[in-house]
């Protein structure tokens, strides 16, 4: 929009009569007192620009609080627009720094403590022949929600996009309108009367139309959540008759769900029956989303036919007041913004209302609005907001497009921290720092025996009880059920494999008992209770090698295994005593992702492998002839060439080949007697059973896809949020229940998980307690330390961070089909791949550059180096898989440790900055860190000492002494340093909006108790006999 058009459009917002006072915004206004000082009074002083050094940092704020707000008043430096020397505002007096000063003040009163805000915008709507009413059109909690045109529904929350012109118009409204801060009122009647009195006194409103405006303000409010059929009856009574519930902390933003329905305030409140709040019209689902202690900000905009120019008011109540019916939810109102204007400009007023509502949701302006002392503070907040906004080109973006809210909102803390004198920001966005990776005290070596364990106990003790109480939630129950089903199957499956490898020495019941003990003990007493210790593939390989060694050298396997277990316990205690966990800081993302990717691939591979294994057990005929199906048979027959094992079995059972009726045996009996299956319908392990295999395939993939669908159900548009969240949390458990029920109803005999029925050792000839020596020689007790060292590394490196609670006596898992559990394995593996950056980088190989996603590391690292990093990581992953799948699996932990050294070698190929984006930085030497820290502290001390020396002391009121740093208070000669308040006043758009105030010469008197005073001091420079002016704002 051009300047002339903008001024013409907004002229009604700024029009004043000839006898009215005008506020001229020239960046800053000041009351200047020119004082001539005698020569001897300023002897030996050079010409300096004197100003108040504003404290911004946290330390300065503490010092400000210590001095007390009663006698330490804020002083602002105001400069005249008619600068004789043409200099701009000093860099320390930008809107950003003024806002930082405002936020740095710490008032002792509780009335100005910022609360969460719920903002609602109502527009005055009317039709010919019908009365006015305020209708809710939008609301803001975190993001904007609009009432859809033509529909009785709310839009999805979206990021509000504002036009720069509407923000300029809003600033003009605050500049020229009525601003009343800390108004004490209890009803909307009182608020309206005080606002109208102020408007009439300032000439903004004519007294003849006062009653019309007042009547419009007190019209009823229609909220979106009210039923359509009730819109024809009065929704609320007149605000003059409505009681209030006022308290600085009243209506905490959440309703008490008890039957009494009490509203808890600060000693005041009423029951649901006695309160004027109509609870039947409160949207309880939305009310739950409002934080406790929240307050309301009401924006009222509209057009009427009795006004010739707009009237504007910004009101802050102190304390906040609950005005029933004004807001759709019963929270106390803190802020009111009113904009009423002549008919024909409703869209313009609507955009101004959206602008102030969006500003109230901004973290910085929100705090400024609470702590503002006068109109200038609010203008500084708007200017700081304008200084931070991002402008989208009009030809490249459609403002009607609604932007989805981001997953995480960026922090605004950097807007609260000032820029250093050298121009560098206090907080800058950059690559992750070195200290961010494994920087917690948990991984720092203490240098004392069991020092880390003692610190862990101290850290965990305060939360030990809450760990149990926090588990009493629906999400924890979902995790328990999921992990129970996911972890019990591997334990029992591993036990079966272990039984085969050790010829029944250790089998399923021992694995189940061991997993239960370690899981419960570790969860109760470990520093991380969400870790489960379970057996893995390398452990199985270790057991196979150890059993083979014992069998070859005629040693007792269980006794030697007991000795190794005792040595392993001792070595683990040594690791704890020496704080060996601190070495984990050398395992960066490079190693973590390779190991995590390997686990995901193992889950996927084993799930598919077990499915193929079912195809071998339940084979099907791949050469069927449909015409000969009736002739297919499969019977049990005597083995033609019985083995020695078969003969030994017959002898032990006291049977002969002739005494058995082979043709009448069942499949299981035939396998028991080592019979042979004969016939065209027989496979390697018995008769063909095609329906079982194909049913297992259906169960397997249905479990996977159903788990994925239910897990993503939270983002679907069906059912209420709570229902969707519950379904998503219990996705895997619900999938297992559904698939078990389907399998039961179909009736196909799919293989089921086998759970031991009795709690007894696999070998009935031994007990639970094994002697570490047994029949072995004495030296085995010592030599067992060598394999124990390798076993310790295996256990230490194979921990998986997850959560599990194992209930050993539960046997309901026997009804779960094995393909369903295999499908769960597949889901666990595939779902875990999504959060690994390594796989995102693999996908970049097949993408052209223009189609690649906007990944943060692609902005700072060349693409070819990203590919090199990925290839190295992929090579290490392949080596891990090859070693794990081969006979050398016992050295698998060593390979994981070797990844650390591979990562260290990459420092030679990549710069530190590139690795900071692709990976975590390796820890440097401790000495280097200490040297850097000492050097930084020394420089800081020297800088502070220099600041103390270069200080001007001026006598102040009441005998106080004003200390002013001189060197830090200089004019900015850097053209990149911009004061947006000054620059905005130069724009054609702002001049067009302010053109009607340029002719006004009378400045509105400053009624603020903290009236800024500016002293112009003339310094005489003796050598050059020249006079220089400097300005002090006190």
Curated annotation (Swiss-Prot):
Phenotype seen when the gene is deleted: Deafness and blindness due to degeneration of sensory receptors in internal ear and retina. Mice show impaired hearing and reduced locomotor activity and rearing/grooming behaviors. Show defects in the mucosal protective responses to luminal acid, both in the pH recovery of enterocytes after luminal acid exposure and in the acid-induced HCO3(-) secretory defect in the duodenum. Knockdown in mesenteric small arteries leads to a dramatic decrease in the Na(+)-dependent base influx and in steady-state pH.
Region (Essential for cell membrane localization and transport activity) location: 815-915
Activity regulation statement: Activity is inhibited by 4,4'-di-isothiocyanatostilbene-2,2'-disulfonic acid (DIDS - an inhibitor of several anion channels and transporters).
UniProt-recorded Gene Ontology molecular function terms: active monoatomic ion transmembrane transporter activity; monoatomic anion transmembrane transporter activity; sodium:bicarbonate symporter activity; solute:inorganic anion antiporter activity
Biased segments, Basic and acidic residues type: 78-90
Region spans: CA2-binding: 918-920
TM helices/strands, residue ranges: 477-497, 506-526, 564-584, 594-614, 686-706, 730-750, 777-797, 813-833, 877-897
Mode of membrane association: Multi-pass membrane protein
Record's subcellular location: Basolateral cell membrane; Apical cell membrane; Cell projection, Stereocilium; Cell membrane
GO CC aspect terms: apical plasma membrane; basolateral plasma membrane; cytoplasm; plasma membrane; stereocilium
Reactions mediated catalytically: hydrogencarbonate(in) + Na(+)(in) = hydrogencarbonate(out) + Na(+)(out)
Intervals, Cytoplasmic compartment: 498-505, 585-593, 707-729, 798-812, 898-1034
Main localization (coarse): membrane
Induction: Repressed in the brain by chronic continuous hypoxia (at protein level).
Biased composition (Polar residues): 250-260
Comment block on domains: The PDZ-binding motif mediates interaction with the CFTR, NHERF1/EBP50 complex and probably with USH1C.
Entry-linked PANTHER family: ANION EXCHANGE PROTEIN, SODIUM BICARBONATE COTRANSPORTER 3
Record-stated family: Belongs to the anion exchanger (TC 2.A.31) family.
Descriptive protein name: Sodium bicarbonate cotransporter 3
Organism placement in taxonomy: Eukaryota, Metazoa, Chordata, Craniata, Vertebrata
Gene assigned in the entry: Slc4a7
